[in-house]
Regions:
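Mixed-charge, glycine-accented linear interaction segment located at domain edges/termini
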Residues: 127-160
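Positively charged, aromatic-enriched nucleic acid-contacting surfaces
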Residues: 56-63, 108-136
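Intrinsically disordered, low-complexity regions
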Residues: 1-28, 63-69
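Beta-strand/loop nucleic-acid-binding surfaces
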Residues: 71-78, 132-136
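Active-site helix/loop of acyl-thioester processing domains in fatty-acid/polyketide metabolism
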Residues: 84-96, 150
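Non-catalytic linker/capping segments at the edges of enzyme domains
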Residues: 18-53, 57
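Conserved active-site and cofactor/substrate-binding residues in soluble primary-metabolism enzymes
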Residues: 55, 79, 83, 141, ...
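Hydrophobic beta-strand-centered segment that forms part of the acyl-chain substrate-binding groove
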Residues: 97-105
Length: 160
């Protein structure tokens, strides 16, 4: 199997996006296609969550400039939202030139709409000025929304 075919097979397994984005190269791809070199910021592609007893393991997969970024986190099942957010943040770590941790991640009800909310803490600032907040509507999958809320919190810091 050549490198291009091997890469496409990996993307086919890793992506929750339609396979039409992967097959056939870059012809007709839109500028926001996460698998092209033109993607300006990391794009969420998939999140995997496995629960074993009282433990949860999350793996986040993002794409940027045609490259795949993967991050993971394992922890207590009671902290599932924070584990998913931490896995997403772990995938982004190579792109960050500052220290950041997940302060909290949760699903809130906003006038009848479920919203994923992530609060990230930069550096060791505990005054609140080092906080980044991101949100995303839950559109079916809570884990997807949590991952997108982390990207939302870091959006301005990751933009070019």
């Amino acid at each position: 199997m050549d490198d291009l075919t091997d890469r496409r097979e990996h993307l086919r397994l890793a992506s929750s996006r339609p396979l039409s984005l992967i097959n056939g190269g870059h012809q007709g791809d839109t500028p926001d296609d996460p698998f092209t070199d033109r993607t300006p910021r990391p794009a969420f592609t998939s999140i995997g969550v496995r629960v074993t007893g009282d433990r949860v393991e999350a793996t986040a997969i993002l794409a940027l400039h045609g490259h795949i970024l993967t991050g993971g986190c394992i922890g207590d099942a009671a902290d599932r939202a924070s584990i998913v957010a931490s896995a997403t943040l772990s995938a982004l770590t190579p792109l960050l030139d500052f220290e950041v941790t997940v302060d909290s991640a949760l699903i809130v009800d906003a006038t009848g709409h479920d919203v994923a909310l992530s609060i990230l803490r930069t550096g060791d600032d505990h005054t609140g000025s080092g906080l980044l907040v991101g949100s995303a509507l839950v559109r079916g999958d809570v884990e997807d929304a949590l991952a997108r809320s982390v990207l939302s919190a870091l959006n301005r810091r990751l933009g070019h």
